Amino acid sequence: MLKMSGWQRQSQNQSWNLRRECSRRKCIFIHHHT
């Protein structure tokens, strides 16, 4: 149970980082093409 919750937290953090990276890239992309 503890391991499962830890894995869930890690996966959630990973998806959050991915989303943040995507938005940052989008920002850079927009700034680069304006």
UniProtKB/Swiss-Prot annotation:
GO terms for cellular component: cytoplasm; late endosome; nucleus. GO terms for molecular function: DNA binding; DNA-binding transcription factor activity. It is found in: Nucleus; Cytoplasm. The keyword Cytoplasm applies. The keyword Protease does not apply. Keywords: Cytoplasm, Nucleus. One of its GO terms (biological process) is gene expression. This is DDIT3 upstream open reading frame protein. It comes from Homo sapiens (Human).
